[in-house]
């Protein structure tokens, strides 16, 4: 102990209270513990304040788990349950998804010509037949000469008679409405003898030449008395001169 004090010196004095330094009153000492018997003057320990029924429980001090929500209720449907068996759809599933449909080769190659579903040995179109019996071809490609190209050129000239009327469209025929003819026509009432006699009399009156002549004379008289008639002014002038 003497060696320790010789090395580090004597123990320093404790720091003075804040009142001695001029910073105001210091921290009060802790209260003494209550007696074991618990007399009438002792107060009960402080408890957490109960929140009103309408207030939010998250803000109130409800213990260490006041921020956690209530756990969801237990449900029958979970991720591990088989929905097909739960809803009794096993028969429908086996009916539509259990059978294996045989698909043809033409379903995968719809753009290829010919009979695709037949084997290639029938029409000699397999790869083996091409390897064993290659087609006969020339050794090299020869360009087309000018005389051969002349057969594909278009030359100006008159059109043949067969092709002259090809651009003219034929007139469209007016199709009669068949549905109108197919409709049931109303039956025409039979003519009575009195109606036929009346029609005959009307025709005779219209064909009478004297009546036509009378109509023409009436029209002429009306035209003479009308102011638009050209001879009206001269007749009025002659009548006025005779009166003088």
From Swiss-Prot:
The keyword Transcription regulation applies. Its main location: nucleus. Keywords: Activator, Nucleus, Phosphoprotein, Transcription, Transcription regulation. GO terms for biological process: positive regulation of transcription by RNA polymerase II; positive regulation of transcription elongation by RNA polymerase II; positive regulation of transcription initiation by RNA polymerase II; RNA polymerase II preinitiation complex assembly. Residues 234-244 have a biased composition (Low complexity). Residues 26-47 have a biased composition (Pro residues). One of its GO terms (molecular function) is transcription coregulator activity. The keyword Transcription applies. Residues 1-56, 171-244 are annotated as: Disordered. GO terms for cellular component: core mediator complex; mediator complex; nucleoplasm; nucleus. Residues 171-182, 212-224 have a biased composition (Basic residues). The modification Phosphoserine is found at residues 194, 226. It is found in: Nucleus. Component of the Mediator complex, a coactivator involved in the regulated transcription of nearly all RNA polymerase II-dependent genes. Mediator functions as a bridge to convey information from gene-specific regulatory proteins to the basal RNA polymerase II transcription machinery. Mediator is recruited to promoters by direct interactions with regulatory proteins and serves as a scaffold for the assembly of a functional preinitiation complex with RNA polymerase II and the general transcription factors. PANTHER family: LUNG CANCER METASTASIS-RELATED LCMR1 PROTEIN (PTHR22536), MEDIATOR OF RNA POLYMERASE II TRANSCRIPTION SUBUNIT 19 (PTHR22536:SF1). Component of the Mediator complex, which is composed of MED1, MED4, MED6, MED7, MED8, MED9, MED10, MED11, MED12, MED13, MED13L, MED14, MED15, MED16, MED17, MED18, MED19, MED20, MED21, MED22, MED23, MED24, MED25, MED26, MED27, MED29, MED30, MED31, CCNC, CDK8 and CDC2L6/CDK11. The MED12, MED13, CCNC and CDK8 subunits form a distinct module termed the CDK8 module. Mediator containing the CDK8 module is less active than Mediator lacking this module in supporting transcriptional activation. Belongs to the Mediator complex subunit 19 family. This is Mediator of RNA polymerase II transcription subunit 19. The lineage of its organism: Eukaryota, Metazoa, Chordata, Craniata, Vertebrata. The gene is MED19.
């Amino acid at each position: 102990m003497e060696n320790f004090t010789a090395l580090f010196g004597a123990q320093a004095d404790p720091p003075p209270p804040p009142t001695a330094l001029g910073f105001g009153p210091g921290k009060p000492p802790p209260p003494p513990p209550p007696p074991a018997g618990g007399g009438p003057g002792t107060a009960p320990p402080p408890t957490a304040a109960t929140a009103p029924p309408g207030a939010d429980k998250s803000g109130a001090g409800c213990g260490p788990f006041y921020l956690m929500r209530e756990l969801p209720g237990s449900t029958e449907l979970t991720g591990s349950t088989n929905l097909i068996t739960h809803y009794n759809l096993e028969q429908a599933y086996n009916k539509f998804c259990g059978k294996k449909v045989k698909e043809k080769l033409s379903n995968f190659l719809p753009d290829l010509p010919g009979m695709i579903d037949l084997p290639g040995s029938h029409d000699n179109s397999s790869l083996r037949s091409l390897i064993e019996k290659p087609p006969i071809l020339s050794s090299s490609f020869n360009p087309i000469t000018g005389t051969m190209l002349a057969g594909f050129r278009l030359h100006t000239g008159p059109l043949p008679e067969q092709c002259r009327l090809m651009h003219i469209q034929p007139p469209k025929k007016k199709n009669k409405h068949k549905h109108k003819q197919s409709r049931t026509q109303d039956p025409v009432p039979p003519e009575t003898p009195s109606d036929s006699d009346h029609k005959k009399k009307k025709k005779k009156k219209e064909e009478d030449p004297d009546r036509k002549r009378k109509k023409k004379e009436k029209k002429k008289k009306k035209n003479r008395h009308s102011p638009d008639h050209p001879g009206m002014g001269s007749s009025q002038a002659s009548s006025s001169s005779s009166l003088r």
